[in-house]
Amino acid sequence: MNGFMIPLALSILAHVLADFVFQTDNTAKEKSEQQAKGFLKHWIVVFLTLVVLMMPFGLMDVLLYCVVLSLFHILLDVFKSSIESKRGPATRFSMFIIDQLLHLMLIVFLVPISSFTIASSFSAFIVWIDFHTGLNLAVLPVSKMLSVLIVYLYVLFAGAVFIRKLFDLIYKNQPDYLERIVGNSSSLDNVRTGKAIGIFERLLVLTLYLTGNVASITIVIAAKSLARFKNFDNKDFAEYYLIGTLASVMIAIIGGMILEVL
């Protein structure tokens, strides 16, 4: 199984990039509305991301694998969308988690039954780098490096989706909860920037956890709280902020714990 660790990691990396980094809000909206063009655009992104990341193994060797995996990826998305369209926030929250598990299980199933051969051009490139720079890329812990990258991307970007769906679940009886909490459109624009703030927050918390500076995490939380201090008079906002911050920190710490055992 060790020989499959790199293609396995590259496949998971392609999935994370295609689902959470390269997928636009418009494409996600089209998929949620079960529009064919949304699924088609997402399939193209998934397929091209897979092809690019699998290039070290040679295009012809992995082309069938990329086609099969990307098609099954879209079928899972169609299945998820068809269920979510008939249900509420609780189903969408659980289906998000189930969908990610199914995608990972699909990759784990397909990789061992596929053939991966290092392309001669890629091997020549490694030799060229070694000869001209003295860097022996062959001894790099590639699998570990890919694992770190995957967990970081999941924590940063999938974490944002998880938190949004968590809020939708908590405030399921208040469909306009954002407007009610922030009070006006200008504040609503500020709430949208919370996604970017959350990404940086999880980046810092995860890095601090992995470097053993757990106590410094409180400084990150304190700095974020100071920036929003004047909004805490609004009880609804204070609860919203607390839930989001705790969920964000929890996701980052869980990511760090996963990396510790990998």
Please tell me what each predicted stretch does.
Residues 1-85, 100-184, 196-198, 204-210, ...:
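Hydrophobic alpha-helical transmembrane segments
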